């Protein structure tokens, strides 16, 4: 199985300024992400950034980075530019690892890539784990996904899906026993041909209402398959508290 890992790293962040360059045990966060990705089975790991400072920081630690335009509306648009710059063939597979995931498990990267390889009818693969509790089911910041028996995504939503009619009757807020409720994890594998088409796809109503970019692909008829894992991976870094948690994890490892 051959695949490339691309790590989109946008320097601007409203909650955590200069997030890709935040120090984690002596190295920038984006470098820590690249180190984790390099432990996977990827043939190549490349950072795609909009700022020369990130490119320089990556190079200083021996990691390759490509400079992309600063005006991309999404990280997927940034990947589209990157695959063209790298000259990747249409049938190649790219795994998108977010630049704020310094604790990502290399085995998860491999598993999502393998899920796409095993599904020639699909353009995208992603990942999900069982919902932990009722709080997660009703939390709009926890994205849910429902799938077919062969792990094809039917829908992604911030709403509590599937809706357990009897268990939730009368306004109850519980996680019904046995409910096939899955928490979406934001790691993706793409076929390069899809990434090249993505910038031309128009936003649909579902994406606009849910604010979930993956719905754009589904609204245009693209198939997404979902790797199921038993437990949730470590959360990404979005806040100063998240950053301190990641720093502590690395300190404990060293």
UniProtKB/Swiss-Prot annotation:
It comes from Bordetella pertussis (strain Tohama I / ATCC BAA-589 / NCTC 13251). CDD domains: CMP-KDO-Synthetase (cd02517). Its main location: cytoplasm. It is found in: Cytoplasm. Keywords: Cytoplasm, Lipopolysaccharide biosynthesis, Nucleotidyltransferase, Transferase. It comes from the Bacteria. It catalyses: 3-deoxy-alpha-D-manno-oct-2-ulosonate + CTP = CMP-3-deoxy-beta-D-manno-octulosonate + diphosphate. GO terms for biological process: CMP-keto-3-deoxy-D-manno-octulosonic acid biosynthetic process; lipopolysaccharide biosynthetic process. It holds the Pfam family CTP_transf_3. Belongs to the KdsB family. This is 3-deoxy-manno-octulosonate cytidylyltransferase. Its EC number is 2.7.7.38. GO terms for molecular function: 3-deoxy-manno-octulosonate cytidylyltransferase activity.
């Amino acid at each position: 199985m051959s695949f490339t890992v691309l790590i989109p790293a946008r320097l601007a962040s409203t909650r955590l300024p200069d997030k890709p360059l935040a120090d984690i045990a002596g190295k920038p966060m984006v470098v820590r992400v690249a180190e984790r990705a390099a432990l996977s089975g990827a043939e190549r790991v490349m950072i795609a950034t909009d700022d020369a400072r990130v490119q320089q920081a990556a190079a200083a630690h021996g990691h390759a980075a490509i400079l992309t335009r600063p005006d991309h509306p999404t990280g997927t648009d940034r990947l589209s530019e990157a695959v063209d710059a790298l000259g990747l063939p249409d049938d190649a597979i790219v795994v998108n690892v977010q630049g704020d995931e310094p604790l990502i498990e290399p085995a998860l990267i491999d598993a999502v890539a393998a899920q796409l390889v095993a599904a020639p009818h699909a353009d995208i693969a992603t990942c999900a784990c069982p919902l932990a509790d009722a709080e997660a089911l009703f939390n709009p910041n926890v994205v849910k996904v429902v799938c077919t028996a062969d792990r094809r995504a039917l829908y992604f939503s911030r709403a509590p899906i599937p809706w357990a009619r009897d268990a939730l009757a009368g306004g109850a807020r519980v996680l019904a026993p046995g409910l096939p409720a899955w928490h979406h994890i934001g790691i993706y594998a793409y076929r390069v041909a899809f990434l090249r088409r993505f910038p031309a796809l128009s936003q649909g109503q579902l994406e606009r209402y849910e604010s979930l970019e993956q719905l754009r692909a589904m609204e245009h008829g693209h198939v997404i398959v979902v790797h199921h894992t038993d437990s949730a991976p470590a959360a990404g870094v979005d806040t100063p508290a998240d950053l301190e948690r990641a720093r502590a994890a690395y300190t404990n490892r060293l």
